[in-house]
Design a protein with these regions (language model features):
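Acidic, proline/glycine-rich low-complexity IDRs
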Residues: 94-146
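N-terminal "domain-start" segment
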Residues: 1-86
Length: 146
């Protein structure tokens, strides 16, 4: 999703000692696959995940917005004025609209925690949501590190 690339580029360019990873993986669902196998197939490596339960769209949007708006402190993060800028707000609206679109197509949204095999290196924040839609799975994942 272009909105993920755009906001990650903005945060990575304007942050210090701070790297943002955002990705959306999509693939066919398998009725017989366990959660670890299904998510592992999406990210392309073995993973161990914790299922934190089903969530509603509002919870998804609140968590993603909170994570992406992380300011940090001296030495890491993004300057507060950048997170308050019109450019950031516009980029965040794009991500929120894309997340709403994913949620509208999903029969379920599950919050996950990737315990092993995370495709990035989470330090400051992380999120992972698995959307089940018809015959496919969509994993919306984000994290930040130093």
């Amino acid at each position: 999703m272009r909105s993920l690339e755009d906001i990650a580029e903005f945060l990575n360019t304007n942050g210090w000692n701070y790297t943002v990873f955002l990705m959306c993986y999509e693939g066919p669902s398998s009725l017989h696959a366990d959660l670890d196998s299904a998510v592992g197939r999406l990210v392309g490596s073995e993973v161990v995940v914790e299922d934190l339960g089903q969530v509603e769209e509002a919870e998804l949007l609140a968590e993603v917005a909170s994570c992406l708006s992380f300011v940090g402190s001296d030495g890491e993060g993004v300057e507060p004025q950048l997170v308050e800028s019109g450019e950031f707000r516009s980029l965040l609206i794009g991500v929120m609209n894309d997340a709403k679109h994913l949620a509208s197509r999903a029969s379920t949204i599950r919050r996950l925690r990737i315990l092993e095999g995370h495709p990035a290196y989470p330090v400051f924040w992380e999120f992972a949501f698995l959307f089940t839609a018809s015959s496919k799975l969509i994993l919306f994942i984000g994290s930040s590190s130093d």
